[in-house]
C-alpha cells in the first residue's frame, strides 16, 4: 500500500484525488492526508462540485478534522510550514506537493524531515532535484534512490512524447512551440494590479501573452536538444484544455502521412495511454477530462518542402497531468 499526502489542494491536488477514485480506485494507493490553508468546508465543496469536471460521484463530507470520501477518512491539516506536518506518524510514503509555490530541494527536504519517504512536485522544480520525469518518456530512469522528483509541467508532458517520437523517426533539427493555454488562477477576473503588466488585464476579455520556461524544461528531459527549441505562450479565455502548436525541421524528407502514421504507431505502442490520435472535427471542450498527456489532431498536420513540419496537439492540462502524477508516483515506488 502506497500512502500519499497532498500538500496544496488546488486545481491539481483536487484532480489527483478525483483521478485516483474515478480511475476505478487503485487499491495500492491511499490518500491519508491533505494539507491546505483553505477552510475545510470549501475543500469539501470543491471536491464535490467542479466547474470543469462536474460532480464527483463519491460522497464527500467533513468528519471532525478529516474529510470522508466514500468510506475513506483523510486527515486535514492547515500548516504553513511543511516541517511541522505529521508525515512520520502517518507513514507517508510520497508527498505530492501541488502548491505551485515550493520547488527547491530545500523545500522538499522539509517534507522529508517531517518523515515523508519521497516528494513529487506537480510543477517544474529547480535543477538540484533528483529527477524530472515525463511519464512515458523517461520514467525508466528511476532507480529507487530518488527522493525528490518533479513531474515537469502539463505542457512539457504534452509536447515531449511527440518530439521524442518524431526525433526517433525523422531526426529533428530544431523547432518552435506555441502554447495556447486556458486561463489560470494567477490572472485577474477584472483589471487589477499584478507584477506582470499583461496579467493586470481581465482574463475573460483578452488573449494574453505570458512568459514560459517550456524550452528549458524540454532540455532537462531531452538534453540533446539544448538550444534547439524556443517557446512562447498565450492564455486564452477558456477555463480548461490547452492547445499546442509545434513546428519542427527534420533531416529526413517526410509527408503528412509519414508524420501522422508515426504518431499513430506510438499511440498504439509504447505511448499507449499517454499519446492519443484523432482526425475527428473536435474543439477544445471535447478534450475536457481526457486522461492522455497529449492528443494529436491529425487533420491539422502540415508539411512544407518535405522538411518543415507543423502540427496541433491538445491536452487537458488538469486531468491529464493529475493522472501522470499518479503514474509517476507508482513508478517512483515500484523502482524501490
From Swiss-Prot:
Record-level GO BP terms: pyridoxal phosphate biosynthetic process; pyridoxine biosynthetic process
UniProt keyword list: Cytoplasm, NAD, Oxidoreductase, Pyridoxine biosynthesis
Record flagged with keyword Oxidoreductase: yes
Catalytic site positions: 154 (nucleophile)
Residues annotated to bind NAD(+): 11-12, 317
Known pathway: Cofactor biosynthesis; pyridoxine 5'-phosphate biosynthesis; pyridoxine 5'-phosphate from D-erythrose 4-phosphate: step 1/5
Record's signal peptide: none
GO molecular function, one term: NAD binding
Cysteine disulfide partners in this protein: none
CDD domains linked to this entry: GAPDH_C_E4PDH (cd23937), GAPDH_N_E4PDH (cd17892)
Location relative to the cell: Cytoplasm
Presence of keyword Cytoplasm: yes
Top-level class of the enzyme under EC nomenclature: oxidoreductase
UniProt similarity note: Belongs to the glyceraldehyde-3-phosphate dehydrogenase family. Epd subfamily.
InterPro entries assigned to the protein according to its UniProt record, in alphabetical order: E4P_DH_bac, GlycerAld/Erythrose_P_DH, GlycerAld_3-P_DH_cat, GlycerAld_3-P_DH_NAD(P)-bd, NAD(P)-bd_dom_sf
Binding site for substrate: 153-155, 199, 212-213, 235
Site, Activates thiol group during catalysis: residue positions: 181
Assigned GO CC terms: cytoplasm
Gene: epd
Catalytic activity, EC: 1.2.1.72
Classification via Gene3D superfamilies: Dihydrodipicolinate Reductase, domain 2, NAD(P)-binding Rossmann-like Domain
Function: Catalyzes the NAD-dependent conversion of D-erythrose 4-phosphate to 4-phosphoerythronate.
Source species of the chain: Aeromonas salmonicida (strain A449)
Catalysed transformations (reactions): D-erythrose 4-phosphate + NAD(+) + H2O = 4-phospho-D-erythronate + NADH + 2 H(+)
Assembly information from the UniProt record: Homotetramer.
NCBIfam families attached to this UniProt entry: E4PD_g-proteo (TIGR01532), PRK13535.1 (NF010058)
Protein name: D-erythrose-4-phosphate dehydrogenase
Amino acid at each position: 500500500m502506497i500512502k500519499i499526502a497532498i500538500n496544496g489542494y488546488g486545481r491539481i491536488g483536487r484532480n489527483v484525488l478525483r483521478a485516483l477514485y474515478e480511475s476505478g480506485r487503485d487499491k495500492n494507493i491511499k490518500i491519508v492526508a491533505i494539507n491546505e490553508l483553505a477552510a475545510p468546508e470549501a475543500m469539501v465543496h470543491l471536491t464535490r462540485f467542479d466547474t470543469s469536471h462536474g460532480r464527483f460521484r463519491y460522497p464527500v463530507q467533513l468528519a471532525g478534522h478529516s474529510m470522508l470520501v466514500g468510506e475513506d477518512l483523510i486527515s486535514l491539516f492547515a500548516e504553513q510550514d511543511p516541517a511541522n506536518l505529521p508525515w512520520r506518524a502517518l507513514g507517508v510514503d510520497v508527498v505530492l506537493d501541488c502548491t505551485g509555490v515550493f520547488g527547491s530541494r530545500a523545500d522538499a527536504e522539509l517534507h522529508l524531515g517531517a518523515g515523508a519517504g519521497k516528494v513529487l512536485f506537480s510543477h517544474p522544480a529547480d535543477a538540484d532535484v533528483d529527477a524530472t520525469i515525463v511519464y512515458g518518456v523517461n520514467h525508466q530512469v528511476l532507480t529507487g534512490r530518488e527522493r525528490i522528483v518533479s513531474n515537469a509541467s502539463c505542457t512539457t508532458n504534452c509536447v515531449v512524447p511527440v518530439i521524442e517520437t518524431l526525433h526517433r523517426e525523422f531526426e529533428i533539427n530544431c523547432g518552435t512551440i506555441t502554447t495556447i493555454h486556458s486561463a489560470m488562477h494567477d490572472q485577474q477576473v477584472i483589471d487589477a494590479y499584478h507584477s506582470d503588466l499583461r496579467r493586470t488585464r481581465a482574463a475573460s476579455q483578452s488573449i494574453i501573452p505570458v512568459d514560459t520556461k517550456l524550452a528549458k524544461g524540454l532540455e532537462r528531459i531531452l538534453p540533446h536538444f539544448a538550444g534547439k527549441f524556443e517557446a512562447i505562450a498565450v492564455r486564452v479565455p477558456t477555463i480548461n484544455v490547452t492547445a499546442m502548436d509545434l513546428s519542427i525541421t527534420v533531416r529526413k524528407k517526410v509527408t503528412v502521412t509519414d508524420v501522422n502514421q508515426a504518431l499513430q504507431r506510438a499511440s498504439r505502442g509504447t505511448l499507449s495511454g499517454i499519446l492519443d490520435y484523432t482526425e475527428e472535427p473536435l474543439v477544445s471542450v471535447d478534450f475536457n477530462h481526457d486522461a492522455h498527456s497529449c492528443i494529436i489532431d491529425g487533420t491539422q498536420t502540415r508539411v512544407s518542402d518535405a522538411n518543415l513540419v507543423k502540427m496541433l496537439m491538445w491536452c487537458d492540462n488538469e486531468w491529464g497531468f493529475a493522472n501522470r502524477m499518479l503514474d509517476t508516483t507508482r513508478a517512483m515506488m515500484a523502482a524501490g
